[in-house]
Design a protein with these regions (language model features):
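Radical SAM enzyme core and accessory elements
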Residues: 52-226
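A structural motif corresponding to the C-terminal lobe/cap of the Radical SAM core domain
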Residues: 1-81
């Protein structure tokens, strides 16, 4: 998705009529406008703020499920999300520093935590799914804080060891050894149904998400419960 800004190039009809429509603009390349008689300077600045996060979060496809949920179910319009987040981003000076992948997730969560109408449980689960999807191995950096209680974690792994179909028929067919089970999998708290997410529906459901990382493949994920 490209967010472009009107330019008054030399020799164009619009530039010749700039005064008629109240355009103010940069008189040297790239000739971008500052304002006109219907779009004040402050609105241009707000749109500019949206540009940076649009590129990093939507066009880069780093967290498609999360952003789709936010622009569809949480914010009134996609622009409301990108503009609001973009302004928050700019106010904190993040546009002037570099960002690791993990930083992008934490910065979005930081913004959403300031809003009263956001279900952070759903958002955090979607963010983790987006974060894990391109990974072939368990990530070394654990930027998230949600953990399964130790006794619950032991019980869940014990159930999978006893009957692999607890993690689904597809996982059972992999014949994963106990060593690889512990070496290449994670279990995290979940606030949505992963089964429904695969059908492009976000359905709130408290439980656990099992992730098995496979070299060269997308991780296997499934809802599990005791």
């Amino acid at each position: 998705l490209q967010l472009g800004f009107l330019k008054l190039l030399r020799g164009t009809g619009l530039r010749l009529e700039a005064q008629k429509y109240g355009y103010t603009y940069v008189d040297v390349a790239p000739y971008e406008i500052f304002s006109n008689n219907v779009l004040p300077f402050d609105d241009i600045v707000r749109i500019k703020h949206a540009e940076d996060v649009l590129e990093k979060y939507w066009n880069a496809h780093r967290m498609d499920a999360t952003i789709e949920y936010l622009v569809t179910d949480v914010f009134d319009t996609p622009f409301d999300f990108f503009q609001g987040f973009g302004t928050y981003w700019e106010e904190r000076g993040w546009s002037r520093i570099g960002h690791q992948l993990e930083d992008l997730f934490m910065r979005l969560l930081d913004f959403l935590s300031t809003l009263p109408h956001v279900d952070l449980g759903i958002v955090k689960t979607l963010m983790l799914i987006d974060y894990f999807k391109p990974q072939s191995f368990i990530p070394r950096k654990t930027w998230w804080t949600e953990r399964v209680a130790e006794d619950q974690l032991k019980a869940l792994y014990a159930a999978i060891r006893q009957d692999a179909t607890v993690a689904g028929e597809e996982f059972a067919a992999m014949n994963v050894s106990e060593k690889d089970l512990f070496k290449h999998s994670l279990i995290i708290p979940s606030s949505i149904s992963y089964k429904d997410l695969q059908k492009e529906r976000v359905v709130k459901q408290d439980g656990y998400l099992f992730i098995y990382f496979r070299q060269g493949q997308t991780p296997y994920m499934v809802d599990i419960k005791l």
